[in-house]
Amino acid sequence: MLLTRKNVAVRPARAARRDVRAMSLLGNLFGGGSKPTSSTSNFHQLSALDIDKKNVDFKSLNNRVVLVVNVASKUGLTAANYKEFATLLGKYPATDLTIVAFPCNQFGGQEPGTNAEIKAFASARGFSGAGALLMDKVDVNGANASPVYNFLKVAAGDTSDIGWNFGKFLVRPDGTVFGRYAPTTGPLSLEKYIVELINSR
């Protein structure tokens, strides 16, 4: 069936899933190369620049659950994910849950903006406050991938490329990786694991 403007508007989730499958296939064919490696043994040993180019030492996130996600502003999955991020941020204090969002422009060029534009976009959708860490734009796959993403893939036991925008990782309060989740997995569907990890401290 041809995707008309009406069809895309009525079924955005279905269209987004097709995008994810298509890009995953392209990634398998043309991306990748060598598998990522990491000498880091714990998420809390890492650091990265935030959206304002300030260094964030992840040991400051000790004893809280961390959801790491690669975000984009112009993706079919954007609206639903940011809405669910806002719901989680409204329910759990930063001392329980922090969402660490890395803008990435590797998938269809869907995060083309400047850091200032990305920050304004995220803030307007409720991604703000102490529990919302918006990071500097990074690559998540390939030779220039962020060391954070190399670590997450290795620690999760799945070194395949991130398939699309909004791939997710859950990190335990002790800095070990709990799980890796597909772009189509909504943030709220992970809430049961988030609560479990909060209560495990």
From Swiss-Prot:
Function field: May constitute a glutathione peroxidase-like protective system against oxidative stresses. Hydrogen peroxide, tert-butyl hydroperoxide and cumene, but not phosphatidylcholine hydroperoxide, can act as acceptors.
GO molecular function: glutathione peroxidase activity; phospholipid-hydroperoxide glutathione peroxidase activity
Subcellular location: Mitochondrion
EC number(s) recorded for this UniProt protein: 1.11.1.9
Annotated source species: Chlamydomonas reinhardtii
Domain of life: Eukaryota
Catalytic-site annotation from UniProt: 75
Transit peptide: 1-27
InterPro entries in UniProt: Glutathione_peroxidase, GPX_AS, GPX_CS, Thioredoxin-like_sf
Keywords, comma-separated and alphabetical: Detoxification, Mitochondrion, Oxidoreductase, Peroxidase, Selenium, Selenocysteine, Transit peptide
Conditions for induction: By selenium, particularly under autotrophic conditions. Repressed by photooxidative stress (by rose bengal).
Official protein name in the record: Glutathione peroxidase 1, mitochondrial
Cited Pfam families: GSHPx
